[in-house]
UniProtKB/Swiss-Prot annotation:
Annotated function: This enzyme is involved in nucleotide metabolism: it produces dUMP, the immediate precursor of thymidine nucleotides and it decreases the intracellular concentration of dUTP so that uracil cannot be incorporated into DNA.
Record's protein name: Deoxyuridine 5'-triphosphate nucleotidohydrolase
Catalytic activity: dUTP + H2O = dUMP + diphosphate + H(+)
SUPFAM superfamilies in the cross-refs: dUTPase-like
UniProt-listed CDD domains: trimeric_dUTPase (cd07557)
A Pfam family of this chain: dUTPase
Gene Ontology molecular function terms on file: dUTP diphosphatase activity; magnesium ion binding
Family named by the database record: Belongs to the dUTPase family.
PANTHER family assigned: DEOXYURIDINE 5'-TRIPHOSPHATE NUCLEOTIDOHYDROLASE
EC number: 3.6.1.23
Cofactor(s) the protein needs: Mg(2+)
Source superkingdom: Bacteria
Enzyme class: hydrolase
Length: 147
């Protein structure tokens, strides 16, 4: 699979850190360090525009080390880059940690994971006819317990 990328000057292509990596690293395309205060959200540019093949998406996911060590997360994780989007890929990062986090120029800030997409046909049904029943029904949000 090939994804065409239009890069701003000095920007690198997304790179897989290891042979078995699922996510390719995305880097911050900023000129100066950017401080992210506790509780703050920031939009970080990557300097990359992508042409994703129809039937696929690119999911933007957080880096696990950022989450564990600093409380830095991709807010809308996974973020979706649709096949028909041609704008710059930007990453929404939030600091859920207790101290200010500094994003340095060209720092790896997120991962891009390519995934297939299926577009479903949604059909409305009459409420009397309804949906088929299951043993779970409408129970959700922790209904299976905490252990």
């Amino acid at each position: 699979m090939t994804i065409l990328c239009e890069l701003e000057s000095g920007v690198s292509l997304p790179e897989y850190a290891t042979e078995g990596a699922s996510g390719a690293d995305l880097r911050a395309n900023i000129k100066e360090p950017m401080a992210v205060l506790p509780g703050q959200r920031v939009l970080v540019p990557t300097g990359i525009k992508m042409q994703i093949p129809q039937g696929y998406e690119v999911q933007v996911r957080p880096r696990s080390g950022f989450a564990l060590k600093h409380g830095i997360m991709v807010v809308n994780s996974p973020g979706t880059i649709d096949a028909d989007y041609r704008g710059e890929v930007c990453i929404i990062l939030a600091n859920f940690g207790e101290s200010t986090f500094i994003i340095e120029p060209k720092m790896r800030i997120a991962q891009a994971v390519v995934a297939p997409v299926v577009q479903a046909k949604f059909i409305a049904v009459d409420q009397e006819e309804g949906l088929t029943t299951t043993s779970r029904g409408s129970r959700g949000f922790g209904h299976t317990g905490e252990k």
